[in-house]
């Protein structure tokens, strides 16, 4: 029990997170210029990213300068190596909360679809499929599954891709020999 006799539970944890997020919002986030805030929100959906992904997802050719400014003036970014960048988990949770408040579903889907394109160009099909699924682009999911099945016939990738195959309508699978082969 806490002070006041209230039991410690999920409601208390949710309230604590809410208060921390309100603090982050007023003490940190709102002090940034609009381009930095937009940049942070557009990268938040991704566990990690590199400069190329930051450019592609945000559409900002100035992404390198923005990342450099964030690196020099904040401690919110972690670098795995010279290329891979992450937000600190607590700050990423805040940014995702902020993203839910500031961006429409359509704008969030567009971010995931741009992330999907980045991964597709890198031939990282599992991440591309995840992004396109979250972005609601089922035609790209189907296209990538067909491409993957044609690139790796009979290689047993079905278990890795099963949830994406199952998300497709049966009629679409039956209309594509490559999709049927990929499921076998």
Feature-to-residue mapping (PLM):
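Extended alpha-helical scaffolding segments used for macromolecular assembly and cargo binding
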Residues: 105-183
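Residue-level marker of structural boundaries
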Residues: 3, 45-48, 63, 72-76, ...
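Short acidic/histidine-centered micro-motifs embedded in hydrophobic/aromatic stretches
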Residues: 1-4, 42-43, 57, 69, ...
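Flexible, glycine- and charge-enriched loops at secondary-structure boundaries
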Residues: 14, 18, 60-63, 105, ...
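C-terminal boundary/linker of central alpha/beta nucleotide-binding cores
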Residues: 22-100, 110
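Amphipathic helix/helix-loop-helix segment enriched in hydrophobic residues with interspersed Lys/Arg
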Residues: 1-19
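Short, polar/flexible loop-turn hinges at active-site or ligand-entry regions and domain interfaces
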Residues: 6-11, 60-61, 99-105
């Amino acid at each position: 029990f806490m002070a006041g006799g209230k039991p410690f539970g999920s409601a208390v944890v949710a309230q604590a997170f809410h208060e921390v997020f309100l603090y982050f919002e007023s003490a940190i986030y709102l002090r940034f210029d609009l381009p930095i805030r937009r940049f942070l929100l557009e990268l938040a959906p991704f566990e990690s990213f590199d400069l190329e992904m930051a450019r592609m997802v945000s559409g900002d050719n100035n992404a390198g300068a923005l990342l450099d400014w964030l690196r020099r003036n904040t401690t919110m970014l972690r670098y795995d190596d010279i290329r891979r960048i992450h937000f600190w988990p607590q700050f990423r949770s805040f940014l995702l909360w902020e993203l839910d408040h500031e961006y429409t579903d359509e704008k969030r889907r567009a971010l995931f679809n741009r992330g999907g394109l980045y991964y597709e160009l890198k031939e990282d099909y599992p991440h591309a499929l995840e992004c396109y699924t979250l972005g609601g682009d089922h035609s790209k999911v189907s296209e990538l599954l067909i491409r993957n099945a044609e690139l790796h016939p009979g290689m047993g990738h079905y278990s890795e891709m099963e949830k994406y195959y199952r998300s497709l309508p049966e009629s679409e699978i039956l209309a594509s020999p490559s999709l049927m082969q990929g499921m076998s």
